[in-house]
């Protein structure tokens, strides 16, 4: 797939930053114009104003690039890689250039699916040098039969010791606020009846939500900001189910995980400075 690059412009506004701070239980008043945006919070920017008539059947909006219609209506993010080259000042005008990579078709136990990477390069409006380079990996799947997913029958897994541990219970208000901040209309995050048609027993937590809290753990326990992040979503994270967030050092990197209620790893990431 050799689709042309697509560009979008935005402004890193103070009210938007303060709403993200409130979601993460930080003091919104501690942020002011000219401060540096905490790394990772750029996810609140560049949410394309997709026309209602152009939303996918699952509610998913434009991803920053135009993807071909592959006949695969279910969308999920498989992972993301981020290089933080520099920082975005609050109040700055920013531009994002997005490109889609090749589409890889595969098949497995769940049927036919496709993988596609979308690369985003963000720069300040008066400087062509990127401040953030991000690659998001998406999985497109066939429609589900509509039967609720069965609970895992695997034995509970022990959560290994870590330098920092935090319990997070994503609830409906957290999902609503995150979707509002990021203008995310993907229905599995707020429409229970629709989520069940995709085989989920309840609402699905956007994988970026625990990512944001893991980045907060990194700042609190490591000190300073990360230079890079590499994460994989390994299992659905369900609304109301407790997550155990862990952080531990491994060599020059820090490993972070979100463990589900049975100890299973739902999200795994590495960050470095």
Residue ranges and their predicted role:
Residues 1-36, 151-210, 217-220:
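A contiguous, surface-exposed recognition patch within enzymatic or periplasmic domains that forms
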Residues 15, 27, 40, 44-49, ...:
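Surface-exposed loop/turn and secondary-structure junction residues enriched for glycine/proline
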Residues 1-93:
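Hydrophobic, proline/glycine-rich low-complexity stretches
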Residues 54-64, 82, 138-141, 155, ...:
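Phosphate-binding glycine-rich loops and adjacent basic patches that engage nucleotide phosphates
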Residues 41-44, 73-75, 82, 113, ...:
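Flexible, active-site-adjacent loop/turn segments at secondary-structure boundaries
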Residues 21-24, 54-56, 60-63, 74-78, ...:
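A short linear-motif detector with a strong N-terminal bias
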Residues 189, 193-252, 256-266:
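Catalytic-pocket segment enriched in acidic/His residues
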Residues 1-5, 75-170, 233, 237-240, ...:
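HotDog/MaoC-like acyl-thioester-processing domains
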């Amino acid at each position: 797939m050799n689709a042309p690059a697509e560009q979008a412009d935005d402004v890193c506004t103070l009210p938007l930053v303060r709403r993200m701070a409130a979601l993460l239980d930080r003091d919104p008043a501690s942020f002011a114009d000219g401060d540096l945006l905490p790394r990772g919070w750029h996810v609140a920017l560049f949410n394309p104003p997709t026309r209602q008539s152009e939303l996918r059947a699952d509610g998913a909006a434009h991803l920053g690039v135009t993807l071909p219609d592959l006949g695969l209506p279910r969308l999920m993010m498989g992972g993301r890689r981020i290089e933080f080259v520099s920082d975005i000042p609050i109040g700055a005008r920013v531009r994002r250039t997005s490109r889609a990579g090749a589409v890889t078709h595969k098949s497995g136990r769940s049927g036919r699916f496709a993988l596609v990477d979308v690369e985003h390069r963000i720069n300040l409006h008066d400087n062509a040098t990127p401040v953030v380079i991000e690659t998001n990996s998406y999985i497109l799947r066939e429609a589900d039969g509509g039967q609720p997913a069965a609970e895992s029958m695997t034995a509970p897994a022990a959560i290994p010791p870590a330098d920092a541990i935090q319990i997070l219970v994503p609830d409906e208000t957290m999902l609503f606020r995150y979707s509002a901040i990021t203008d995310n209309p993907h229905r599995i995050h707020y429409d229970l009846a629709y989520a069940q048609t995709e085989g989920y027993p309840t609402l699905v937590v956007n994988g970026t939500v625990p990512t944001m809290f893991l980045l907060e753990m990194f700042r609190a326990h490591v000190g300073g900001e990360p230079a890079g992040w590499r994460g994989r979503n390994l299992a659905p994270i369900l609304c109301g189910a407790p997550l155990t967030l862990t952080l531990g050092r491994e060599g020059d990197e820090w490993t972070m995980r979100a463990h589900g209620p049975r100890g299973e790893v739902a999200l795994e990431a590495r960050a470095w400075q």
